[in-house]
Regions:
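Cytoplasmic-side transmembrane-helix entry/capping segments in multi-pass membrane proteins
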Residues: 73-84, 101-109, 131-139
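Pore-domain transmembrane helices of cation channels
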Residues: 115-161
Length: 232
């Protein structure tokens, strides 16, 4: 019985790994990220279940990271970070007075960084360029926006201030709506100006995101075009 369970578990891990290592997984991740970045904020504003959905989706994205690499070291780091993240979320949503909101989001940022690194590795492996790889580049861009939103949550939780202007922040998960909006506006260098950075750390984060937003497409597109032309 134990051997049977172990065999089934190993098979499940192999199946998940073969899916997340394949190019087709880029599309699945894109759908998950579009939901997390563009659709969820709308759901969070109109429904009480939005926060739970957001947490489930965020954890699902990071969970997929465990299976998106063959490197044992990266699998271990992803799995450990995911486990800590999940535990801290469960503690916060459980019936107890404990909450590690800042630590939780710091772990979330570390998780996002590892996942971005894993995705960049997937993107440039075996020097092939196809539609899926372009989708993969979009995924990394959206992951940067997500990371920016988590960083804003940390700044706000640690300092009590982050964004000013046409915005009311509650200090809870609901603030994600404003943070992802500001993060995307900074990353795309649009900067609508209705919401703006108040303290220095938020200002530096906004300019850092803008710098990434300008450099990332230039570097990644140049690399993909270079690979495509060298193959032809």
């Amino acid at each position: 019985g134990v051997n049977c369970a172990r065999y089934a578990m190993r098979n499940l891990v192999r199946t998940l790994q073969s899916f997340w290592l394949a190019d087709a997984s880029f599309v699945t991740l894109l759908i998950m990220l579009i939901a997390a970045v563009f659709v969820l904020p709308v759901i969070m504003e109109i429904s009480g279940h939005g926060v739970l959905l957001f947490n489930i989706l965020l954890l699902s994205v990071f969970f997929s990271g465990i299976f998106s690499t063959r490197s044992v070291g990266l699998i271990a780091v992803s799995a450990i970070l995911f486990s800590i993240h999940l535990t801290l979320r469960l503690i916060r949503f459980g019936d107890n007075p404990y909450s590690f909101f800042v630590l939780e989001n710091v772990i979330g940022i570390a998780n996002a960084l590892v996942f971005i690194f894993i995705n960049l590795q997937l993107l440039f492996r075996d020097r092939i360029v196809n539609t899926y790889r372009i989708v993969g580049a979009v995924n990394v861009y959206l992951l940067l926006a997500l990371m920016g939103a988590l960083a804003l949550e940390v700044i706000h939780a640690a300092t009590g201030v982050s964004l000013g202007g046409n915005v009311v922040l509650s200090g809870k998960d609901d603030d994600y709506v404003h943070f992802i909006y500001f993060s995307l506006a900074s990353l795309t260098t649009v900067g609508f100006g209705d919401i703006y950075a108040v303290n220095t750390s938020t200002k530096m984060l906004a300019t850092f995101l803008s710098t990434l937003g300008v450099l990332f497409p230039a570097i990644v597109i140049a690399r993909l075009v270079g690979l495509a032309s060298s193959r032809s």
